[in-house]
């Protein structure tokens, strides 16, 4: 075989490997254990719900939207708050913010004080959120951990919640794809490859691009923090009225 052919084959192998390492959802048919739907946790819920993601809390930066979140939760009579991953910017930040013993600051940061609300947490990207193995060192209260993926049963509708890092392991690539090429196409692809029924909704984070696709029943919460020159903060969430079966993008004023 000619050296040029070997070089081309080598380049193709490297390209395919890098593609699969970033877009890991395409490994699900080969490695089913990677598919978070295999061990999805079912949770019964009732009432209006707010989904937010990608707050990327940092120990050296005060979160500016506590009052805005509290106002939305209170004014819309939200029963459930679901944080769809990447609550922290890094496990180190998580330890510095909520790693001390005693009362967790999470309720204060998220504006939950004085509200009759259930709060839940979906595991985000490993470079950002602490793993479930670190439960003993990071006090997530009052957030209830639901693992890497959850099925929320509202009776009127089913909502799958997954952060979305298998759509694109490098968040910047996923952001650029959704922003410049085809919005919510990664979300639609993940839903199909993961085997989620067409009738179910899926709520994501990760790309920092808010959006709702009613036809395919996928939605993204959007992000809260700027990342270098590319990622701009949307400061949005998704409000769900299960009685109406509808999602709405809500924006938070500082």
List where the protein language model places each region.
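Short, motif-level signal for alpha-helix interfacial/capping segments enriched in acidic residues
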Residues: 30-38, 63-66, 182-192
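Short strand-coil-strand connectors
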Residues: 153-156, 215
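Active-site-proximal beta-strand elements of phosphoester/diester hydrolases
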Residues: 48-56, 157-170, 218-223
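Active-site environment of divalent metal-dependent phosphoester hydrolases
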Residues: 56-60, 88-92, 122-133, 167-170, ...
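Conserved beta-sheet core of the metallophosphoesterase superfamily
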Residues: 137-148, 176-254
